[in-house]
């Protein structure tokens, strides 16, 4: 399933990435701009998720009253809660499942693009890419940690293109090889080679990427925790919430020592943009503002129904 999703979304995202790279001449800047475009495109989904979260907060008070009323009858309580959700037009799709699913699908596509920088940016033909893959099979078999699997052979190729220049010249034209060499030389961030995997046992400048990835993830997680604690104090008391707050940064730190630096740079960019987006939606679509707007809309709808009913009764009397 994962491979199918990646195979579907990656080609869609690789075209704009290639165009942005041709315009900027910087791979990292191209990733940054593409991620911004995707965040903007998904903003309506994020806003909907924020509004549904606010609506859920408002419904929690009614749900708690139902549970207290039917404390000795869990089946009846669940029936009443479901009836409440139906009246409010609130279902599983509104609870964040659908928006999160959409974002996850796009994220998988982005990961696919990150693991295939050559085919995504330079857009070599599938025949050339397959020939290059066979050349890099030897690197993968040697256990090069930058080519742990066939999924990362393109990143390994960027690191080892000089070593395999002779074999590559047999499958690539002089122009293609020149493009590959130029791209490999630009495949850097702050002077760090994006094809290199940071070594947890060997302190170096590459440690900067895992540290930044962890710190940016931690800031975003703490902000979300404080936000949830304010909106739903009862949920915040759940020990799992505190655990998840630090689990994500810890996993981010661990994984960035397992994957090439380029993947870690993408995570840093994504963490920063997600944090900015969280602040924006929390300010513009704060729960208080959303709930107030919902109450106004419900009042208008209720009065409209009352007026319609009143007119119908008056017409029936005539």
Language-model segments: residues:
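Helix-loop-helix
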Residues: 1-318
């Amino acid at each position: 399933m994962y491979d199918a999703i990646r195979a579907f979304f990656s080609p869609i995202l690789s075209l704009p990435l290639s165009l942005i790279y041709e315009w900027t001449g910087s791979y990292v800047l191209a990733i940054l701009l593409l991620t911004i475009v995707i965040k903007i495109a998904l903003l309506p989904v994020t806003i909907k998720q924020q509004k549904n979260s606010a609506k859920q907060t408002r419904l929690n008070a009614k749900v708690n009253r139902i549970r207290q009323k039917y404390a000795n009858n869990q089946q009846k309580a669940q029936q009443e809660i479901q009836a409440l959700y139906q009246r409010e037009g609130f279902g599983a799709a509104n609870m964040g499942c659908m928006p999160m699913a959409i974002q996850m699908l796009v994220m998988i596509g982005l990961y696919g693009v990150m693991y295939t920088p050559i085919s995504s940016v330079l857009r070599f033909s599938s025949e050339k890419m397959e020939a290059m893959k066979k050349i890099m099979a030897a690197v993968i078999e040697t256990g090069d940690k930058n080519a742990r699997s066939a999924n990362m052979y393109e990143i390994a190729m960027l690191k080892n293109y000089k070593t395999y220049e002779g074999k590559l010249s047999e499958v690539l034209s002089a122009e293609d090889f020149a493009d590959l060499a130029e791209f490999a030389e630009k495949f850097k961030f702050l002077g760090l080679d994006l094809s290199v995997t940071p070594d947890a046992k060997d302190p170096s400048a590459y440690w900067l990427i895992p540290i930044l990835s962890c710190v940016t993830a931690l800031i975003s997680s703490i902000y979300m925790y404080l936000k949830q604690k304010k909106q739903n104090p009862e949920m915040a008391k759940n020990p799992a919430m505190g655990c998840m707050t630090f689990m994500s940064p810890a996993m981010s730190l661990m994984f960035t020592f397992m994957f090439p630096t380029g993947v870690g740079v993408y995570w840093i960019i994504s963490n920063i943009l997600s944090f900015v987006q969280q602040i924006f939606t929390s300010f513009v679509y704060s729960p208080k503002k959303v709930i107030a707007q919902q109450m106004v809309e419900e009042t208008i709808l209720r009065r409209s129904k009352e007026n319609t009913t009143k007119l119908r009764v008056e017409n029936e009397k005539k």
